[in-house]
Design a protein with these regions (language model features):
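Active-site HxH/HxHxD metal-binding segment of metal-dependent hydrolases
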Residues: 1-44
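Catalytic core of the metallo-beta-lactamase
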Residues: 28-96
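Metal-dependent phosphodiesterase/nuclease catalytic metal-binding core
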Residues: 66-109, 114-137, 142-172
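FMN-binding flavodoxin-like domain, especially the glycine-rich phosphate-binding loop
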Residues: 87, 98-136, 141-143, 185-200, ...
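Short, charged N-terminal beta->alpha structural module
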Residues: 171-193
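Residues immediately within or flanking Cys/His clusters that coordinate Zn2+
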Residues: 329, 347
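Short, non-ligating residues that shape and space the ligands of small metal-coordination modules
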Residues: 341-342, 358-362
Length: 362
């Protein structure tokens, strides 16, 4: 921390901007005497080295600046271009198989830490493009001294919310196993069609990993049980997390489950409807506890629709998430029980909570 540094080296000059100074005070660090405040385009010459400062707000804090050393052509990039994971004795990205050992951590770092701020990242990349950068030193992860174009291309894709892989991510949240079984069968059917697929049980896997692959894949299937007339909580947490990170331009599909009142599909569609350019395939699979005899054909149809959409073949039937299919019949506003019929008898009472017909809505 700056405070610890100044205790050990009281003559140190802290170089920062005005917002950084305000944050130092908020964290109860005494404002250092003789601090040097800099802004966009300012330079600092230390002899052979001249550092130029560039603002990078919200990548990923509002005060962030990066600095460029013109002598050695080094970009000190703060959190940009960083990764999760320990170095384990490795200093440079070209000393490892980055795709195998680091790419997943780099993507997970970007999506979870910076992913919401794609426009700000693109603005920083535009500034960097005008510099003769030959080495990138981030705060987290290995240093880059080769293949900088590879790194920049990844960031451009992530920051513009473009998928890296045309394939399907399946995220399932199951209570008694019925939803998980259906999700597993769908994954098998997609694999049989040659479609790249990744399956996660969001009750077991932390949502940060699923969010990362949501940025990676072009298509996402959300499969969730109904819980207390809502979305099973691990799935709701994932959906909220994806929405909060501003993911967009994806095609999705839904599998909902509910032993007596399946409602998760409609609610998942509502959350997806708040996101930009999220489309849903028409094929929504509804389970009641588990796959019923003959329902495997619904999964086959969903696999066909997903495969066609992934391949960009004849346009798969899609609809705006706001128009996602609604359950047929009438739903109890108290407990969520669905009465499947075109009409509701006036003397009807909910078999679950006992409420009268007046407490039902279409």
């Amino acid at each position: 921390y700056p405070g610890d540094l100044l205790v050990r080296y009281p003559g140190t000059t802290i170089v920062c901007n005005g917002k950084s100074m305000n944050l130092l005070r908020q964290f109860h660090w005494s404002a250092p005497k003789g601090a040097m405040l800099v802004k966009e385009g300012d330079t600092l010459c230390t002899g052979r080295h001249t550092f130029t400062f560039y603002s990078a707000p919200m990548v990923h804090w509002p005060e962030v600046m990066v600095s460029y050393d013109a002598a050695d052509h080094i970009l000190f990039s703060a959190d940009a271009f960083g990764t999760f994971g320990a170095l384990n004795g490795v200093l440079f990205a070209d000393e490892v198989d980055f795709d195998r050992d680091w790419l997943d951590d780099a993507r997970r770092y970007y999506t979870n830490i910076v992913g919401k701020y794609g426009p700000q990242v693109l603005a920083l990349l535009k500034k960097v493009e005008g510099l003769d950068v030959r080495m990138v030193c981030p705060l987290h992860g290995p240093i880059w001294r080769r293949d900088l174009g590879y790194l920049m291309d990844k960031y451009k894709k992530w920051a513009s919310y473009q998928p890296e892989v045309r394939g399907v991510l399946i995220a399932c949240a199951s209570i008694y196993g019925g939803t998980e079984t259906a999700a597993g069968i769908l994954a098998c059917r997609l694999a049989e069609r040659g479609i790249p697929v990744e399956l996660y049980d969001v009750s077991v896997t932390h949502c940060s990993y699923v969010l990362s692959d949501a940025f990676k894949y072009s298509h996402i299937v959300f499969a969730s049980a109904t819980y207390n007339n809502g979305i099973f909580t691990p799935m709701e947490e994932l959906l909220r997390d994806i929405a909060h990170h501003a993911l967009q331009d994806r095609t999705g599909a839904l599998i909902q489950n509910g032993s007596w009142a399946p409602a998760s599909g409609k609610l998942m569609a509502q959350i997806l409807g708040e996101m930009k350019n999220m489309e849903l395939l028409e094929q929504t699979v509804t389970l009641k506890s588990a796959l019923a005899p003959g329902q495997d054909q619904e999964l086959e149809a969903l696999a066909d629709a997903l495969a066609a959409s992934v391949r960009g073949e004849q346009e798969a039937p899609e609809q705006a998430v706001a128009d996602a299919p609604k359950a047929k019949g009438f739903i109890c506003k108290i407990c969520g029980f669905i009465y499947e019929s075109d009409t509701l008898p006036e003397d009807f009472r909910c078999p679950i909570c006992g409420r009268p017909a007046s407490d039902f809505e279409p």
